């Protein structure tokens, strides 16, 4: 939403960039698909360290949702627990970037910015851009992000 005034400083509390129930929706869809396909593992890339105040990126939320899906699905009631895996939850941005780099992720095809321009250039000033820049710097890797300035 281009009308949102995205802050350039990280503040305490839930930021204006919060998307209501985003991870609840993602995990609900993943749980339904997993149950239908007889898969008992769900993966989600939440991160509590650099989470910018989003409540659905915390371990408490993930644990609560895991209990919910196992109480509210046939799979869970039948005793075949669905697992939610969060491999990035305790990693720093630097470590996430290194991990992805080692897996061959092409970071030029990814974005973090909340205020991309029409050409896909990142603002370079929002908290997501700042965390990304710092992560690449600390990881000792070149940041392929196209920034406006």
Kindly give the residue locations of the regions a language model identified.
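Nucleotide-activated chemistry modules centered on ATP-dependent adenylation/adenylyltransferase
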Residues: 1-149
């Amino acid at each position: 939403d281009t009308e949102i005034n995205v802050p350039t400083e990280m503040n305490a509390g839930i930021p204006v960039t919060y998307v209501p129930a985003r991870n609840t929706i993602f995990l609900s869809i993943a749980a339904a698909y997993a149950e239908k396909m007889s898969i008992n593992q769900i993966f989600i890339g939440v991160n509590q360290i650099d989470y910018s105040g989003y409540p659905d990126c915390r371990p408490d939320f993930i644990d609560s949702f895991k209990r919910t899906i196992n109480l509210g699905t046939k799979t869970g009631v039948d005793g075949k627990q669905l697992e939610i895996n969060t491999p990035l939850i305790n990693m720093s941005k630097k470590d996430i970037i290194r991990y992805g780099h080692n897996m061959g992720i092409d970071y030029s095809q990814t974005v973090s910015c909340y205020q991309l321009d029409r050409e896909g250039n990142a603002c370079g000033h929002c908290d997501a851009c700042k965390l990304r820049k710092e992560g690449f710097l600390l990881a000792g890797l070149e940041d392929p992000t196209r920034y406006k300035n």
